[in-house]
Amino acid sequence: MRYEHDSTATVLADSYNGKKLNSPNDVVAHPDGSYWFTDPPYGGQLYEGEPDGAGGPSNAAGKLNPRIGQPAGFVPGKRELPTNCYRIDPSGRIDLVVSEDQVPDPNGLAFSPDYTKLYVISTGKGPGDTDPGGKGDMSVFDVSADNKLANQKRFSDFMIDGVKCGPDGVRCDVNGNLWVSSNAGRHVGYSGVTVWAPSGQLIGRIRLPEVCGNICFGGPKRNRLFMAASQSLYAVYTATQGAAPG
């Protein structure tokens, strides 16, 4: 969805090959005018949206009632597509760039400052979901001049001191470091933000008293990190700037 200056809204993508998207989650812009986005299943699950109709991946046994809590006339549907990543070309064409087989349940994604690398986070499946589900890690791909991806590698498994610091959102700074929001569950002191060098080495942490869902750099100098947590919005000034075109 793109909001225009006259307050109208333009739908950029709602389907792929005639099948409706799941629940587009995170999006990044490319200097060539394209938009790259992840399409995980979370909006089609009980705890974040409404479950599939009976027999769907998030309601395989058919015991959940997707109509509860919905307006009159709501018609439940079923997931139609795997959890993939897509690219919206400036022409409007939609291309599949990362498949569910490569990165199941994709979530946050980010380009390196020179746009030669794409980082994609894979999060775990939701309660009751029967899709493949991710492992709470992040992959990195090489990006060619024609926007083809190759050489997938695991960037990090996000295990710190034996604690799984589950990743969600990711942003890159001008030095190529990756800032990743962290969900460590009940492990006190491990939720917040982890910071990684391009080599995959952990170089910093920001500890928050809540699970951190997503992050972004902002402010007049793009040196302030905003952190959206479970019930709060945090901000901190950093000694770097968020990467962006121009």
Model-derived regions, located:
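Asp-box/WD-like beta-propeller blade repeats and closely related beta-sheet repeat scaffolds
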Residues: 1-76, 82-83
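Surface-exposed, flexible loop/turn segments at secondary-structure boundaries
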Residues: 8, 17, 35, 43, ...
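Flexible "stalk/tail and boundary" regions
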Residues: 1-7, 87-92, 175, 184-207, ...
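Beta-rich, blade/repeat-based domains predominating
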Residues: 17-35, 71-72, 76-84, 94-120, ...
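Blade-edge beta-strand/turn elements of extracellular beta-propeller
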Residues: 3-20, 84-105, 141-162, 193-208
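Short loop/turn segments immediately following beta-strands, especially the blade-tip
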Residues: 140-148, 237-245
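Short loop/turn segments immediately following the C-termini of beta-strands
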Residues: 40-42, 123-125, 133, 143, ...
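Structural motif
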Residues: 47, 82, 128-139, 188-193, ...
